[in-house]
């Protein structure tokens, strides 16, 4: 069953699954998907077409990533055509509510604040929290996968340092909630958020910021781009994140309020995709993202 689904996703690349959008608004007959195309390993832009990519609407470029793998799976399972629209992060929800797209498949977390504007599918991936750091700044024995750092250890390590993240994502909120506003009188600063994760990673690489929090697949993708200088700093995040923030480590598909038909279709389709298959698709996306450069 698993092999058939994954082979079907790969085979789908040989089919023409794209169509033009109706300027008067989208319908559920076509999956019109909004994403940044700049959020590795969930989605990014490439000039090369491959079995893993889909063309970006009204562009000569292509989108790759975990979100594209999920889009291909949904297209095959629901037997619907797909359009990929490249949008800035801050434009995703407004575009959904303006009927310019009918789905946000962009590594977006289902939060109470976003729920005020849109609905969400069931999660299509749940991740761990980790940090991106320069190898030269942190002892190699600290924050390993086998021995993740505790909250107190993180506070001590980050004392006097600056943290950075992409704007409008849960990791950026975590910086203030758990580190800048810590109760142990540690002085931890919040660097201005960057527009994308690669730009935030550049801050870490250039020494402007000390560390960047994000979902583990994102951190792994950033380290793959510069294995000589960057590494993953693992932490025992379950020991300090609230239950709501733990939920924030999962990503879901954004759907316009009232579009119950599409929401039910997406949830039924996602339920067929096992955790093992999702992990395999993400591992492939993370590996491919290393072909890009910071």
Q: PLM features: what roles do these ranges have?
A:
Residues 26-108, 116, 193:
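Extracytoplasmic small-molecule ligand-binding "clamshell" domains
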Residues 46-58, 71-79, 152-159, 166-195, ...:
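Ligand-binding cleft/hinge of the Venus flytrap
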Residues 76, 81-157, 236-246:
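Acidic, polar ligand-binding/catalytic clefts
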Residues 90-97, 107-117, 173-182, 202-247:
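A ligand-binding cleft/hinge motif common to bilobed small-molecule-binding domains
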Residues 145-147, 151-189, 264-294:
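Ligand-binding clefts/hinges and TM-proximal coupling segments of bilobed small-molecule sensing domains
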């Amino acid at each position: 069953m698993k092999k058939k689904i994954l082979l079907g996703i790969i085979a789908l690349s040989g089919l023409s699954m794209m169509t033009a959008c109706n300027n008067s608004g989208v319908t559920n007959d076509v999956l019109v998907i909004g994403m940044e195309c700049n959020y590795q390993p969930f989605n990014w832009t490439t000039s090369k077409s491959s079995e893993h990519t889909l063309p970006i609407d009204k562009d000569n470029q292509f989108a790759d990533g975990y979100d594209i793998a999920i889009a291909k799976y949904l297209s095959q399972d629901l037997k619907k055509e797909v359009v990929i629209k490249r949008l800035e992060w801050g434009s995703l929800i407004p575009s959904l509510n303006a009927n310019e797209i009918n789905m946000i498949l962009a590594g977006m977390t289902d939060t109470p604040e976003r729920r005020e504007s849109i609905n969400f599918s069931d999660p299509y991936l749940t991740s761990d929290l980790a940090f991106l750091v320069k190898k030269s700044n942190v002892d190699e024995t600290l924050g390993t996968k086998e021995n993740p750092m505790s909250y107190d250890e993180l506070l001590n390590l980050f004392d006097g340092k600056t943290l950075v993240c992409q704007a409008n994502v849960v990791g950026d909120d975590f910086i203030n909630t758990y580190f800048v506003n810590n109760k142990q009188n540690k002085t931890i600063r919040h660097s201005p958020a960057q527009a994308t994760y690669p730009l935030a990673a550049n801050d870490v690489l250039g020494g402007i910021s000390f560390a960047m929090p994000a979902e583990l697949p994102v951190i792994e993708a950033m380290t793959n781009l510069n294995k000589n200088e960057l590494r993953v700093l693992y932490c025992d995040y379950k020991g300090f994140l609230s239950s709501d923030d733990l939920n924030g480590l999962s990503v879901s598909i954004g759907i316009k309020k009232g579009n119950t038909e599409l929401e039910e279709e997406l949830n039924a389709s996602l339920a067929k995709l096992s955790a093992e298959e999702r992990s395999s698709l993400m591992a492939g996306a993370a590996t491919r993202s290393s072909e890009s450069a910071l």
